[in-house]
């Protein structure tokens, strides 16, 4: 029996307006090499100047993950050669990062686990290599963009725990609004360090790094494949030969990892303090300002359960995504009940959006969905009719009340009007009334159906109550 050991390195691109060591814009999707300057290009004599906003965002993150802030930290040069690194070194942090040890709690299958965070440090991103046939091009727009690299302890024991940790981290940086964490655009990237060991053995065996994974699904598949590969090598007696310290890439088409290059040790990068940057001192004022963080997912979930009576699961679904949480709370402020808002947001609306990327792109805003929920709750329309209204809202837009009026979906809830229909139905079916009163309770459904058929649009709940009172 084997135990999996997983540690994750997550690169979060901070959403500052300008780069970390120069005033170039950080906007995504510009034409190649538009947002560059002598600092980005590593030209001789160009000196970096630290972006203070990046420091504030790092301190806010530290507060959110229960981590120590090193008020004195330094930047270091990480030396290696790669085409997208024009200086031939990356400005990073080594011995004294801004964020020290911290932790995050995760939950998998109802079991809670604490995952340690070793450190989080600021660094500049590299550029991007673009390969077109036999030609390779370099786009340096991304060079010098601020990154916060978050390094976990090797505390995760399976791919489910790794994904739970990543999703928690993803939510936190979005709630803090320090990053858009857009995985498709590379704002939230993950390197997974994976190894195995016999159960009960505390030794850490050879770890393999899987590089630049940018979707939760691919991260999980890559980890699972790599664990399977290492176990198979151990069982076949070729572990020492097949499992070496290296960097591997995940082939998304074939679902396998393949060797990219040997994995360097920290000594190979020849870190030394960057002589062009002064040590960073975080004073009390900056600490106080940066530590004013918003309500985080765990706190919000506890509040929704406590104050609105939501189930733990439903509250977890709501708070997992910042836009979803905002949508839900807007519905509450517009007068929808918490129970109705959960159902119509997470089941009905999201079920209709399907392939769309979350509620931020929903054609139905929170105010209109709240109005629909209120029309169900004040018995203007039935739940069945509300689904028709939502279909129209998604397809065409419009206002809830106008759609109800146009489709003639308004319920009849007047007791007198419903009673007159009930009396007419009972008078026409005297023999069945006698059978019902003699003990054939199943005939109640027949009477309900006849009333609903005779008077379309009547409130079913009212029909039930009034029928019971008439039949005695």
Swiss-Prot record:
Allows the formation of correctly charged Asn-tRNA(Asn) or Gln-tRNA(Gln) through the transamidation of misacylated Asp-tRNA(Asn) or Glu-tRNA(Gln) in organisms which lack either or both of asparaginyl-tRNA or glutaminyl-tRNA synthetases. The reaction takes place in the presence of glutamine and ATP through an activated phospho-Asp-tRNA(Asn) or phospho-Glu-tRNA(Gln). Pfam families: GatB_N, GatB_Yqey. Heterotrimer of A, B and C subunits. Keywords: ATP-binding, Ligase, Nucleotide-binding, Protein biosynthesis. It catalyses: L-glutamyl-tRNA(Gln) + L-glutamine + ATP + H2O = L-glutaminyl-tRNA(Gln) + L-glutamate + ADP + phosphate + H(+); L-aspartyl-tRNA(Asn) + L-glutamine + ATP + H2O = L-asparaginyl-tRNA(Asn) + L-glutamate + ADP + phosphate + 2 H(+). Its EC number is 6.3.5.-. It comes from Wolinella succinogenes (strain ATCC 29543 / DSM 1740 / CCUG 13145 / JCM 31913 / LMG 7466 / NCTC 11488 / FDC 602W). It is an enzyme of class 6 (ligase). It comes from the Bacteria. HAMAP family: GatB (MF_00121). PROSITE patterns: GATB. The keyword Nucleotide-binding applies. Belongs to the GatB/GatE family. GatB subfamily. One of its GO terms (biological process) is glutaminyl-tRNAGln biosynthesis via transamidation. This is Aspartyl/glutamyl-tRNA(Asn/Gln) amidotransferase subunit B. InterPro entries: Asn/Gln-tRNA_amidoTrfase_suB/E, Asn/Gln-tRNA_Trfase_suB/E_cat, Asn/Gln_amidotransferase, Asn/Gln_tRNA_amidoTrase-B-like, GatB, GatB_C_1, GatB_Yqey_C_2, Gln-tRNA_amidoTrfase_suB_CS. GO terms for molecular function: asparaginyl-tRNA synthase (glutamine-hydrolyzing) activity; ATP binding; glutaminyl-tRNA synthase (glutamine-hydrolyzing) activity.
